[in-house]
Amino acid sequence: MNTVRVTFLLVFVLAVSLGQADKDENRMEMQEKTEQGNSYLDFAENLLLQKLEELEAKLLEEDSEESRNSRQKRCIGEGVPCDENDPRCCSGLVCLKPTLHGIWYKSYYRYKK
């Protein structure tokens, strides 16, 4: 019975002492992997940043193209007061004096041609 206890104690001591060495090795290995992982994270972060910058540039180009061609879309429509001397009327609309008298007898309004 004593030999079993001594054997068990010896195996236990060996396992603990070897396990400690493995812990130190594991800790060092984990530090190395973490440092490598940080470099991978930096690489991935830079790659993502480049993609986002490209996407932003494309969106800004689309916005500028839209603003060049959007004058007709933002044109004030029919039945809106206008200035008779202002030539910037939308295509298909003319600035005319209303035919009916009322509260707007001195104003000019936009009508279809």
Swiss-Prot record:
Region annotation Disordered: where it falls in the sequence: 61-83
GO molecular function: sodium channel inhibitor activity; toxin activity
Principal cellular location given in the protein's record: secreted
Disulfide bonds: C75-C90, C82-C95
Tissue distribution of the protein: Expressed by the venom gland.
Annotated signal sequence range: 1-21
Positions of the propeptide removed during maturation: 22-74
Keywords of the record: Disulfide bond, Ion channel impairing toxin, Knottin, Secreted, Signal, Toxin
Compartment(s): Secreted
GO cellular component: extracellular region
Protein family per UniProt: Belongs to the neurotoxin 14 (magi-1) family. 01 (HNTX-16) subfamily.
This protein's domain notes: The presence of a 'disulfide through disulfide knot' structurally defines this protein as a knottin.
Primary role: Probable ion channel inhibitor.
Name of the protein: U11-theraphotoxin-Hhn1w
Species this protein is from: Cyriopagopus hainanus (Chinese bird spider)
